[in-house]
Regions:
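Walker A (P-loop) phosphate-binding loop of P-loop NTPases
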Residues: 325
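Short interface patches used for recognition in eukaryotic signaling and trafficking proteins
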Residues: 286-291
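Hydrophobic positions on the alpha1 helix immediately C-terminal to the Walker A/P-loop
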Residues: 331
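Conserved lysine of the Walker
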Residues: 328
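Hydrophobic anchor at the beta1->P-loop junction of P-loop NTPases
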Residues: 320
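N-terminal accessory nucleic-acid engagement/regulatory domains that precede
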Residues: 1-285
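N-terminal pre-P-loop "Q-motif" helix
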Residues: 292-312, 316
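Phosphate-binding glycine-rich loops of NTP-binding sites
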Residues: 334
């Protein structure tokens, strides 16, 4: 029964971690509205609203490429595609709608009142001739996750990236079958209508989509060297992979639910001098060393000694954590 209880708690924790990722909306794109060509400021990226005179700036990107070629710039510096973004909506209003539908206690979730910022609901990537690229349509995970809660009228929903990928694929397939091109800002409405139909959204107000400004669409030029997608998460893939496979892994369950156990004795090894001395005793050191002209640092050596010693170590080592460049791979080689 205890194992079942821990497994259930573990699943809740994974769902919470996923929601943390989903509830981090991508930054609203910063556009380069003018770009320097010599001493001139040339119109470049563009917003679109009901009063706009700007068209989709594909010609501007091509013209600037020609200018760069004349300056003998490398191909990597040339613009070869653009992202068109739909909407400029208030995060606060959207999350408030979710809280209302889920009947959340607003005193308990008072931080919702402090929310600010804006988000877009999807992007569509096109080449400089208006043809939709392989990247195509990408629905915002933040928009999708909050919408799922609004539709379910509850926060206990299992949101999977696979569902978002499937939605993107279905929308892209419809666009492909109908040979849809994005030659003007208003063509994005075709994409929006397909997505709203798929998600069964009858109106923006129904789901709490309220404009943060009069901007309806935005277009940002991309160079060959630029990141393809705006919707990236470093952790989501890993969390979902672990969530699918954790049930038969006792160490993983124990690690994930460790904070639920009471009366834990934690040792902060970097400040506990007695513990440092204990693990730096002569008999704790390995008999050999990985060939290298470098020696491990103090904390690396302590970690190595702990890892190779079965004495006075009650728990199995589960993971090696740390920011990039802190010596994790070196540490594992030494162990």
């Amino acid at each position: 029964m205890r194992n079942r209880s821990l497994t259930a708690e573990c699943n809740k924790i994974f769902n919470f971690w996923k929601l943390e990722e989903y509830f981090t909306p991508s930054d609203y794109p910063e556009l380069t509205l003018t770009i320097k060509e010599g001493k001139q400021d040339i119109p470049f990226d563009a917003y679109y609203n009901a009063y706009s005179t700007r068209s989709l700036p594909l010609k501007e990107y091509k013209a600037h490429n020609e200018y760069l070629r004349q300056k003998h710039k490398s191909d990597e510096k040339l613009y070869n595609r653009a992202n068109v973004y739909c909407g400029c909506y208030k995060i606060k209003t959207f999350v408030e709608k979710m809280a209302e539908k889920c009947k959340l206690d607003m005193e308990k979730y008072a931080e919702i009142n402090e929310l600010s910022g804006r988000f877009y609901i999807f992007s569509v990537q096109i080449d400089l001739d208006g043809k939709i690229t392989e990247e195509g349509v990408q629905v915002s995970p933040f928009f999708y996750a909050v919408l799922c809660m609004i539709k379910a009228e509850g926060i206990n929903v299992n949101i999977m990236q696979e569902n978002i990928w499937k939605l993107n694929e279905e929308v892209n397939e419809i666009l492909k079958q109908n040979n849809v091109q994005i030659l003007e800002f208003t063509d994005v409405t075709i994409v929006k209508n397909i997505i709203f139909d798929k998600l069964r959204i009858e109106s923006e107000s129904e789901v709490g989509l309220k404009s943060a400004s009069d901007k309806v669409y935005a277009c940002k030029g991309l160079k060959k060297e630029d990141e393809t997608s705006d919707f990236t998460s470093f952790y989501l893939d890993e969390i979902e992979n672990v969530q699918k496979n954790y049930k038969n892994n006792e160490n993983l369950i124990k690690y994930t639910t460790s904070l639920l156990a009471g009366n834990q004795k934690k040792i902060m090894i970097d400040s506990d001098v007695c513990s440092m001395k204990k693990w730096l005793e002569v008999d704790r050191f390995p008999m050999g060393k990985y060939p290298s002209k470098f020696s491990p640092t103090l904390m690396q050596q302590i970690a190595i000694n702990i890892a190779i010693s079965e004495n006075d170590r009650k728990e199995k080592i589960f993971s090696v954590n740390g920011p990039p460049g802190t010596g994790k791979t070196t540490l594992l080689k030494e162990i």
